[in-house]
């Protein structure tokens, strides 16, 4: 009764910590899903720059990484013009932001798919929990890396828009239209921060639970059972030899 009670006290914290680890994986999966979606939507939408409220325009003009759209304020008609070929000359801000956001999209998508394979509810390597934890760790590292180009591209674009507008105001130059960064830029920042958060959960928090669960107890119990058997065998043979030796010693004395 004593050993069984002790075993129940030992297994209860392990099961609780294992549930906490699974919960962290699901929370990270939630953030990774929406972060990857935000990055993809931000890359392929047209509202990275939008005309400010103090502009003398009767229409809303948005500029994205690939095209520019104008929406008439009276009838709501929307027209879009694509930029020139990707091989044409573009501003450094546009080219670098494109490259950074596409890189972030690919890495975030790969990290999310990898994380799905590491979840316990997914029937992938069900008998290898240690490998699944490793897969989740790789997914977290990938998401951390994905957040870097995303946040660099989004913040650089936003800062460039702000500096351009501030320079015009500082020099009293008014062109009739002024831009501010739009919701696509905000979406890129949010997606990048979400990737950082998901990656931090998977790498830092799961590291604290790396010794919890069946991936730890199974090898240890196997080694313990093997060592107990190996030790008990010599003892069982040692008892008859010792008694025989004592009897032989008594006979010789007599």
Curated annotation (Swiss-Prot):
Transmembrane region(s): 23-43, 99-119, 135-155, 189-209
Pfam family, one: PMP22_Claudin
Membrane topology: Multi-pass membrane protein
Topological domain spans for side Cytoplasmic: 1-22, 120-134, 210-254
Free-text tissue specificity from the UniProt record: Expressed preferentially in kidney.
A single MF term (Gene Ontology): paracellular tight junction channel activity
GO CC terms: bicellular tight junction; plasma membrane; tight junction
Summary of subunit composition and partner proteins: Can form heteropolymeric tight junction strands with other claudins. Interacts with CLDN19. Interacts (via PDZ-binding motif TRV) with TJP1 (via PDZ domain). Cannot form tight junction strands on its own.
Function: Forms paracellular channels: coassembles with CLDN19 into tight junction strands with cation-selective channels through the strands, conveying epithelial permeability in a process known as paracellular tight junction permeability. Involved in the maintenance of ion gradients along the nephron. In the thick ascending limb (TAL) of Henle's loop, facilitates sodium paracellular permeability from the interstitial compartment to the lumen, contributing to the lumen-positive transepithelial potential that drives paracellular magnesium and calcium reabsorption.
Similarity comment text for this entry: Belongs to the claudin family.
Cross-referenced PANTHER family: CLAUDIN
Name by which UniProt lists this protein: Claudin-16
Source organism of the structure: Bos taurus
């Amino acid at each position: 009764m004593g050993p069984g009670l002790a075993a129940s006290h030992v297994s209860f914290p392990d099961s609780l910590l294992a549930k906490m680890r699974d919960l962290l994986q699901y929370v990270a999966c939630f953030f990774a899903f929406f972060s990857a979606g935000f990055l993809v939507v931000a890359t392929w939408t047209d509202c990275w720059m939008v005309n400010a409220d103090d502009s003398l325009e009767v229409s809303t003009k948005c500029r994205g990484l690939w095209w520019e759209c104008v929406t008439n304020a009276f009838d709501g008609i929307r027209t879009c013009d694509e930029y020139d070929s990707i091989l044409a000359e573009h501003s450094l801000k546009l080219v670098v932001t494109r490259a950074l956001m596409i890189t972030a999209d690919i890495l975030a998508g790969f990290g999310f798919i990898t994380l799905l394979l590491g979840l316990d509810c997914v029937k992938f390597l069900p008998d290898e929990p240690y490998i699944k934890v490793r897969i989740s760790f790789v997914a977290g590292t990938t998401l951390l890396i994905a957040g870097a180009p995303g946040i660099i591209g989004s913040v650089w674009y936003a800062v460039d828009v702000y500096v351009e507008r501030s320079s015009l105001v500082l020099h009293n130059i008014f062109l009739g239209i002024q831009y501010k960064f739009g919701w696509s830029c905000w979406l890129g920042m949010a997606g990048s921060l979400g990737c950082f958060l998901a990656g931090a959960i998977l790498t830092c928090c799961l590291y604290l639970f790396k010794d919890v669960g069946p991936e730890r107890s199974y090898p240890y119990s196997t080694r313990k059972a093997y060592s107990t058997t190996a030790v008990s065998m010599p003892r069982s043979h040692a008892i008859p030899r010792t008694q025989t030796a004592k009897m032989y010693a008594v006979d010789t004395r007599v």
